[in-house]
Curated annotation (Swiss-Prot):
It comes from Aeromonas hydrophila subsp. hydrophila (strain ATCC 7966 / DSM 30187 / BCRC 13018 / CCUG 14551 / JCM 1027 / KCTC 2358 / NCIMB 9240 / NCTC 8049). GO terms for molecular function: double-stranded DNA binding. May be involved in recombination. The lineage of its organism: Bacteria, Pseudomonadati, Pseudomonadota, Gammaproteobacteria, Aeromonadales. It holds the Pfam family RdgC. It comes from the Bacteria. This is Recombination-associated protein RdgC. It is found in: Cytoplasm, Nucleoid. Keywords: Cytoplasm, DNA recombination.
Amino acid sequence: MWFKNLQIYRFTRPFELTVEQLETQLEACAFTPCGSQDISRFGWVKPLGKFGSTLTHSAAGHILICARKEEKMLPGTVVKEMLAEKVEAIEFEQGRALKKKEKEALKEEILHTLLPRAFSRTSQTFAWINPADNLMVVDAGSAKKADDLLALLRKSIGTLPVVPVALKNPPEITMTEWLNEGNLPASFTLEDEAELRSAMEHGGIIRCKQQDLMTDEIKNHLANDKLVTKLALNWGETLSFVLGDDLSIKRLKFSEELREQNDDVTSEDPAARLDADFALVTAELAQFIPALFAALGGEEQSI
């Protein structure tokens, strides 16, 4: 429930589905485990897990959904070795080289044999729909993983008018100005980590950790055409995170003081605690996200 990464999207049209309508449409793409011949499966699961009963969870107008992916683990080297052995044996027996289509058919046979015995790996991706602010946020460490969830949601509901948030100024320019001037917007403070990249196409990369970012050494790098492409920040003493030049937020952490606010919620009802945590997280992020956009110079356009 405590998001660790944020990939942020803006609705280009208002999200008007009710929770009940969304629930019905998600059911058509509910997750089912891999069958013996499936290499992967992707679908919706209950965001509250065993403590929930629906594919959606809502609190104060915010909606939480969760997608699960199961993938069969088939090491490419194993398949390649088995294929090479089969090809060699058949070519020796028949005295001719196999054609490309024949090799592909053999590979399919090998996969068909191995899949039922392959181990599975599962992962879950949460997403938060904020209709009031026309925002959708995916807890994913990469844009690709977020795109997978968005594609599944689009398939489930027919259309999903969202785009990555576009700012008036590139984030790397603004972050570079912050380090150059040593002056951050209100409520934001520097931490001790950054990534600097050369503005040149094949230039160098400098990664700083556990370092004072206001030193002359850092300023010299910036003076030599380096741009800040990742920057560790703190907001309001409640959130710490690493901001990327693609506007992604990673390694998001909530302060202990914030996390303890729901300690009075009974532990005898896990669903109630999860609901309270979701309400707390979304309330905080609903304030943080517009503050971040404003600090970075504002959005290019929004509905």
